């Protein structure tokens, strides 16, 4: 079932909606103030990478930053959804990584430009198989973790999210229509950091899901 759901997600989903700075600890480590409203950005579905794949670092970058996140998979068309009804629009959950080319992000932000190149490249959204909704009793009480090789880098709980899952669905659907197969990346806890070519990322939702990805070089250089 999980395999068919992930394939359906790849084929049906129209967008990936990222949420930035949704953990106070992460905002603090970046030196940012806590957001008053969700910080929303888009990633293309072409950035998906299935479990076991290789995350590609584009030339001439030496590293990418890892950000482990709970992914919410939308189960039906959602527009202007009240927060109290938001959970009815969830089709499932997954573990995802929001891989970020931090050098490109910092440069873009300094120039007032969008961060699409920093977050939207091929393989920049590694994702697990989809967990059916019934398997996740409370999405706001899950432990996320990530290791690089054998070193634990990130460990946090979704209960520490500033904006919880129902509010995110309500807020985002008031701005843009969400379709079946769309994914919301709900933010990352503290501990982000660089991963380099030749390293291996292992990440999971404790008791529910685990993924593993190699890190390699994208052969074709980023055009300048």
From Swiss-Prot:
Cited PANTHER family: ACYLPYRUVASE, ACYLPYRUVASE FAHD2, MITOCHONDRIAL-RELATED
InterPro entries: Fumarylacetoacetase-like_C, Fumarylacetoacetase_C_sf
GO biological process, one term: oxaloacetate metabolic process
UniProtKB keywords: Isomerase, Magnesium, Metal-binding, Mitochondrion, Transit peptide
Principal subcellular localisation of the protein: mitochondrion
One matching Pfam family: FAA_hydrolase
Cofactor or coenzyme needed: Mg(2+); Mn(2+)
Swiss-Prot/TrEMBL catalytic activity: oxaloacetate = enol-oxaloacetate
GO molecular function list: acylpyruvate hydrolase activity; copper ion binding; oxaloacetate tautomerase activity
Name of the molecule in the record: Oxaloacetate tautomerase FAHD2, mitochondrial
Lineage: Eukaryota, Viridiplantae, Streptophyta, Embryophyta, Tracheophyta
Compartments reported by the entry: Mitochondrion
Residue positions binding Mg(2+): 67, 69, 98
Family: Belongs to the FAH family.
Function, in words: Tautomerase that converts enol-oxaloacetate, a strong inhibitor of succinate dehydrogenase, to the physiological keto form of oxaloacetate.
Domain of life: Eukaryota
Residue stretch of the organelle transit peptide: 1-30
Enzyme Commission designation: 5.3.2.2
Details of cofactor binding: Requires a divalent metal cation for activity. Binds copper in vitro.
GO cellular component: cytosol; mitochondrion
Gene3D superfamilies: Fumarylacetoacetase-like, C-terminal domain (3.90.850.10)
Organism this protein belongs to: Arabidopsis thaliana
């Amino acid at each position: 079932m999980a395999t068919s759901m992930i394939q359906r997600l790849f084929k049906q989903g129209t967008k990936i909606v990222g949420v930035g700075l949704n953990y106070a600890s992460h905002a603090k480590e970046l030196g940012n103030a806590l957001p008053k409203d969700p910080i929303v950005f888009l990633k293309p579905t072409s950035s998906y990478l299935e479990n076991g794949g290789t995350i590609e670092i584009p030339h001439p970058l030496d590293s990418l930053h890892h950000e482990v996140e709970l992914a919410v998979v939308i189960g039906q068309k959602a527009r202007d959804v009240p927060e109290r009804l938001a959970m009815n629009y969830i089709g499932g959950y997954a573990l995802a990584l929001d891989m970020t080319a931090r050098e490109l992000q910092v440069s873009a932000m300094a120039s007032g430009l969008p961060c699409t190149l920093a977050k939207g490249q091929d393989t920049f959204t590694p994702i697990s198989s989809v967990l059916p909704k019934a398997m996740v009793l409370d999405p706001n009480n899950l432990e996320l973790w990530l290791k690089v090789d054998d070193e634990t880098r990130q460990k946090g709980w979704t209960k520490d999210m500033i904006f919880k899952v129902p509010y995110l669905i309500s807020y985002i659907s008031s701005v843009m229509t969400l379709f079946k197969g769309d994914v919301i990346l709900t933010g990352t806890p503290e501990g982000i950091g660089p991963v380099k070519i030749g390293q291996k990322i292992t990440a999971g939702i404790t008791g529910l899901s685990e993924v593993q990805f190699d890190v390699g070089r994208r052969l074709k250089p980023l055009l300048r």
